[in-house]
């Protein structure tokens, strides 16, 4: 156990060294990311959105405290990246123990960090701002409900032909959850595509 504490916003944050997967981030007892396979996850996540829309002017990241999605957006040469993250302590602990994931993304000129409730923060964003919105939240029903409740706000700030990419969980372990996510997207969009990647 490398870290084990409760953050100021009330999340139980742990960094554990796992024999098979290396250093790993847990939030409230659920694994979020492991050093061994994070690159596969983040590169697929960002790449899936770019396959549908190659424009890389401006992106928003909702969540993604480990920094992997931000790193991938930087590597894909997005000009402006607004990173909305609830808990700065998640980012800090990941920079400390999982630095190869985020690669100091918060220090890059193209990245603007907005701390606090993302869905409150985006209320002040102009319409048609982002080419891509990457929703990298915990894969639980609470976050599905939160995204569903705020989907109109996400659609409002998305450019025409823009793409929302979301992490929807494991189809093997939580098929109902994946179905719930898909239902949310089907309700708001005419077309929805599910991309799969195997992550141990």
Regions flagged by a language model, labelled:
Residues 10, 21, 33-182, 186-188:
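The AdoMet/dcAdoMet-binding core of the Class I SAM-like
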């Amino acid at each position: 156990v490398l870290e084990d504490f409760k953050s100021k916003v009330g999340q139980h944050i742990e960094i554990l060294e796992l024999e098979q997967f290396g250093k790993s981030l847990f939030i409230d007892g659920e694994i979020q990311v492991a050093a061994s396979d994070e690159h596969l996850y983040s590169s697929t996540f960002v790449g899936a959105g770019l396959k549908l829309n190659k424009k890389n002017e401006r992106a928003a990241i909702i969540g993604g405290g480990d920094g992997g999605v931000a790193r991938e957006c930087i590597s894909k040469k997005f000009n402006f990246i607004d990173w909305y993250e609830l808990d700065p302590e998640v980012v800090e602990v990941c920079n400390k123990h999982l630095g190869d994931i985020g690669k100091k993304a918060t220090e890059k000129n193209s990245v603007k960090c907005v701390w606090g409730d993302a869905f409150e923060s985006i209320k002040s964003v102009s319409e048609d701002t982002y080419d891509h919105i990457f929703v990298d939240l915990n894969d639980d029903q609470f976050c599905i409900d939160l995204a569903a409740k705020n989907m109109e706000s996400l659609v409002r700030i998305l450019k025409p032909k823009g793409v929302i990419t979301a992490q929807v969980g494991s189809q093997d372990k939580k098929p109902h959850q994946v179905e719930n996510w898909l239902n949310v997207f089907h309700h708001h969009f005419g077309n929805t595509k599910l991309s799969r990647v195997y992550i141990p």
